[in-house]
Amino acid sequence: MALFARVLINLHLSQPTISGYFCGLILPNMNVLVVGSGGREHALSHKIVQSTQCEKLFIAPGNGGTAALGENVALDIENAAEVAAFVKAHAIDIVVIGPEAPLVAGVHDGLKTFPELEDLVVVGPRQAAAELEGSKDFAKEFMMRHHIPTAAYQTFTKDTLEQGQTFLETLDAPYVLKADGLAAGKGVLIIEDLDEAKEELKNMLVDAKFGDASSRVVIEEFLAGIEFSIFALTDGKGGYALLPEAKDYKRIGEGDTGLNTGGMGAVSPVPFFDAALRERTVREIIEPTIQGLVKDNLPYQGFVFFGLINTTKGPKVIEYNVRMGDPETEVVIPRLETDIIDLFVAMHNGTLDQLSVAVNPQTAATVMAVSGGYPGAYEKGKAIHGLGDFEGTTVYHAGTKPGEVITTSGGRVMAFTSFGADKDEALAKSYAALKEVSFDGMNYRTDIGFDL
């Protein structure tokens, strides 16, 4: 490919106008496939089509919002052979894998088994490195091995259930139980009562509460503090680009109460993440992680999500994710002013340490509209009314289905993202736009950013 010999041109558009899926404005020449269907993938797609280097965009399977940016395509995104056939048939230059499941399933590895795809840019780690998210125990061992600050822990199976229950007795409440494998973001339990924690451990290990994901359970000490996330794009050779931080809001209810969700909103930047905390986070967590991947020979070209908590003893890692977060992507990626394709090409070439990242200094805030009943049972197929262009607000679709009338197709339906001089201004714009949109049962939190 002549892909990497080109002069790369940046064009930063604060209010891009997109017509169909032909998005190259100057020297259009690259075809991009984004894998996934959520708000994260819509936000990534929105940023990609702002690049002067994007000729055609495909999204698999996409949603009602991505259909306006590119061509939605029906693919089994965990089937590497099917994805590879599409890549070859449509001369794809860059594949951006949004969700974790295809990465843990080894889709990146599968694509690279085809000699003609040797130069394909794939954003997302190989299967071995994806275990950082695929296995909590694997991630904890990695952190311990590389002296990365995290909570003390032990891992148990159904054969060591009694030892696990005894270990719980040595801890102070609340008790943190984590299913080892992928559990759609629902595999972490924080329990105040010791007897209830013991019973839940049995439910997870013996009764397979989370299926195979809880065949092993990590029990760890509870860390008190305020959570936040930071993101990096790494090139697999020790180079990385640090992206903006964010704080998301997981609980369904006001004041962070009720059941966990995939995320009800997010804010970036995070006011308490000052220069001193940033320096310590980079020194104690980011760089040891990036270097640890190289030392352990874990092939990793892609986004690293650092789920962190700021404690009285400094920042500690709660979890790694091997892709961007959702809804964090909807506030982090819009702030990015560097051409995102430049970043992906530098990642592929191993030259990220030579590239500076420009970030919009304004605050971005997003609020998620969800289906009635979510995160429990909810109905789909509800017509969405009032969608249009909102001044200062971008609507990123998640659980929507394209058609003559766009309808709901998931629990989290749309993210309303706005910029402002501060979080209050940004949130005011998002909430104003939210009030113009409706569907039967629509719900959202009114207090995003309340603790910042």
Cite the ranges covered by each PLM segment.
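ATP-binding N-terminal substructure of ATP-dependent carboxylate-amine bond-forming enzymes
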Residues: V7, Y21, I26-P125
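Low-complexity, intrinsically disordered or signal/transmembrane-proximal segments
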Residues: H12-Q15, Y21
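Active-site nucleotide/adenylate-binding loops and adjacent lid/helix of ATP-dependent enzymes
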Residues: L33, D119-L120, L132-V218, G236, ...
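Internal nucleotide-binding/catalytic subdomain
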Residues: V188-P327
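Active-site "cap" helix and flanking loop/linker of ATP-utilizing ligase/carboxylase catalytic domains
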Residues: V282-V304, N321-F390, K401
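C-terminal hydrophobic structural anchor segments
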Residues: A377-T417, L427
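Generic C-terminus detector
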Residues: T408-L452
